[in-house]
Amino acid sequence: MVHYTNVPQAGTGAQMLFSYVETCYACGVLPGVDFGSVRLNLDAYSSEVKAAATEFGVEEAVVRAIIHAESAFRPNAVSHAGAQGLMQLMPPTAARFGVSDSYDAGQNIRGGVQYLAWLLKRFNGDLTLAAAGYNAGEGAVDRHGGVPPYSETQYYVKRVAQLADRYRGAQATTQ
């Protein structure tokens, strides 16, 4: 998907018509991806995922599920809303968790997992609510007393749960 803007490029005064190419393949409500059979990625960013998962006490399978659902392991992914990198951090969230470069895989994964751990703690270990908060914001989960009634978020929590289960199974067979 190509997006256009009328915002001048910084320092040039020129108008830039091409803004960015959206790279989040699974961001839509019905992205056309079968998450029950899509190929899993157990190898990409192994050391970064393991380090952050260990540091913040989050299952590696859940971290991989979020990365897979958010960016399909593409470090330069950008969403229509402006979320960036592997774990699709919004700039304020990235700043909140000490990420200065959202396109740096190590920083993005560490910040994303730290945020996910914070959400899991806030929602008493409930992955469904934490995933909903990751997608729609914790405030939306609070306002709606659970998973918000947004189609994107409803599908997102199902994707994450399905992918997490598949990553758990795949990791169990490789250990």
Regions found by a protein language model. Name each.
Residues M1-T5:
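N-terminal propeptides/low-complexity segments immediately following signal peptides
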Residues P8-G11:
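A short acidic/small-residue loop/turn micro-motif
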